[in-house]
Amino acid sequence: MILHAQAKHGKPGLPWLVFLHGFSGDCHEWQEVGEAFADYSRLYVDLPGHGGSAAISVDGFDDVTDLLRKTLVSYNILEFWLVGYSLGGRVAMMAACQGLAGLCGVIVEGGHPGLQNAEQRAERQRSDRQWAQRFCTEPLTAVFADWYQQPVFASLNDDQRRELVALRSNNNGATLAAMLEATSLAVQPDLRANLSARTFAFYYLCGERDSKFRALAAELAADCHVIPRAGHNAHRENPAGVIASLAQILRF
C-alpha cells in the first residue's frame, strides 16, 4: 500500500520536492508554492485519512513513515527534500529522524518538535480526544468553526476563517479523527535531541505573527526563516514569502 499523491515532473538531475500538508489539508495545499519550482520534480502527498488517502488508516508515526518510504520507492524518488506544514512538518521530522535513504534535507513550516513532559502530553491527549469525538459526531462546519478559533490561528480574519471552514469541511470526519489521535503530539516523542544530532539539512519556516512557533523555532538547531505578513499557515497567507525562502534554501 502507498499513499495517494500527485506527481509533477521537472528537469532530470535535480532532487524531488516532496510536499506534506497539514491536518485536514490535502495534496493541493502546497501547489501554489510548489509550482514556482517547475525545474524540480514535485510530489504532493495525501497523508493517511486525508484526500485520496482517506481510506488509509495508521496506528502511529511508524506506520506513516513506512507508507511514505514505500510511496517514494514507488515513484522511484532517489534524492529529495521533504517540505511539510504543521502535521506534515511533524511527519517530515519524524521520518527524517528515523532515516530515509536519499534525503537531502527537511523544510518545516510551523511543525512542533514535540512536548517535553508527561503533564503536557496528558493534557494534549485529552484535548485531541475531545476534538476527535467532535469530528466523528458533529457537522464538520461546526467543528472547524471552533477549530479555527484556537489561539494558534489568532492572526486569521473572519473572511479567512470562513474560507478555511468551507474548504476543510469537505473532509471525512471519522478518518480525520483517527489520524488526529494516531499522530497526536501526545504520542510524538520530543525530537529536539535527534534534530540536534541530525545528518541532514534542516530549515524552519514560521510566520512573523506566529509567536508560539517562533518561540519553538528558537529552541531548534535549525536555520530559521521568518515569513513576513503571515501567521501559522504562512504558505497560505503569504505564498510569495514562502517561495522566496524556499528559493534561497534551494539556491534556485
Swiss-Prot record:
- SUPFAM superfamilies from the UniProt entry: alpha/beta-Hydrolases
Q: Name the domain of life this protein comes from.
A: Bacteria
Keyword Cell wall biogenesis/degradation listed: no
Signal sequence span is none
Q: What's the catalysed reaction?
A: 5-enolpyruvoyl-6-hydroxy-2-succinyl-cyclohex-3-ene-1-carboxylate = (1R,6R)-6-hydroxy-2-succinyl-cyclohexa-2,4-diene-1-carboxylate + pyruvate
Functional pathway: Quinol/quinone metabolism; 1,4-dihydroxy-2-naphthoate biosynthesis; 1,4-dihydroxy-2-naphthoate from chorismate: step 3/7; Quinol/quinone metabolism; menaquinone biosynthesis
Entry EC no(s): 4.2.99.20
Q: What GO MF terms are annotated?
A: 2-succinyl-6-hydroxy-2,4-cyclohexadiene-1-carboxylate synthase activity
The alphabetized UniProt keywords are: Lyase, Menaquinone biosynthesis
Asked whether the UniProt record includes 4Fe-4S among its keywords, one would answer no
A Pfam family matched in the record? Abhydrolase_6
Summarize subunit and interaction data from the UniProt record for this chain. Monomer.
Function (record text): Catalyzes a proton abstraction reaction that results in 2,5-elimination of pyruvate from 2-succinyl-5-enolpyruvyl-6-hydroxy-3-cyclohexene-1-carboxylate (SEPHCHC) and the formation of 2-succinyl-6-hydroxy-2,4-cyclohexadiene-1-carboxylate (SHCHC).
UniProt similarity note: Belongs to the AB hydrolase superfamily. MenH family.
What protein am I looking at? 2-succinyl-6-hydroxy-2,4-cyclohexadiene-1-carboxylate synthase
The organism encoding this protein is: Escherichia coli O8 (strain IAI1)
